[in-house]
């Protein structure tokens, strides 16, 4: 049996150390939302039928494990929807939940680009979309090949 390797268009293999996608996560409501932005256009990510993930937001004083589970599930939703790794996020969280979110993201190995409170986001767009656009702006860029 012969195996073959799929290469990138320029012929070089993909960089396994390159940063993954950056998403916006809103945990300020009763159920978390996840979104991604490309070129400044954001879209809310949803689960496929039969693969739903429970994203109920725990109380601010809940155990750290509950917050970590929420962050991991939000990341899972994003990775399934995008079919690529997610490594960075901007999270919308009430002030009381900010510390929990920060610790949970660290445990889940998700790099927090910023935590914003709901009152820091103005405008008619849903907060998760604004967070996704901010995540795209703050995410590390992949260097162009030389």
Per-region residue spans from a language model:
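Detector for methionine-enriched segments
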Residues: 1, 6, 60-64
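Gly/Thr-rich phosphate-binding beta-strand-loop-beta motif of the actin/hexokinase/Hsp70
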Residues: 2-46, 125-146
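Conserved phosphate-binding loops in N-terminal lobes of ATP-dependent enzymes
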Residues: 19-21, 28-114
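Conserved phosphate-binding/catalytic loops in two-lobed NTP-binding clefts
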Residues: 106-128
């Amino acid at each position: 049996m012969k195996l073959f390797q799929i290469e990138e268009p320029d012929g070089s293999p993909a960089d396994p150390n390159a940063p993954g996608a950056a998403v916006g996560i809103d945990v300020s409501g009763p159920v978390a939302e996840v979104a991604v932005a490309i070129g400044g256009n954001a879209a809310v990510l949803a689960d496929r039928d039969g693969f739903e993930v429970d994203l109920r937001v725990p109380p601010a004083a809940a155990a750290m494990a509950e917050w970590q589970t929420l962050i991991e599930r939000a990341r899972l939703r994003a990775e399934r929807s995008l079919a690529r790794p997610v490594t960075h996020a901007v999270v919308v969280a009430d002030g009381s939940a900010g510390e929990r979110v920060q610790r949970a993201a660290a445990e889940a190995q998700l790099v927090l680009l910023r935590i914003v409170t709901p009152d820091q986001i103005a405008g008619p767009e849903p907060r998760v979309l604004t967070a996704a656009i901010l995540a795209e702006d703050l995410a590390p860029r992949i260097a162009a090949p030389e």
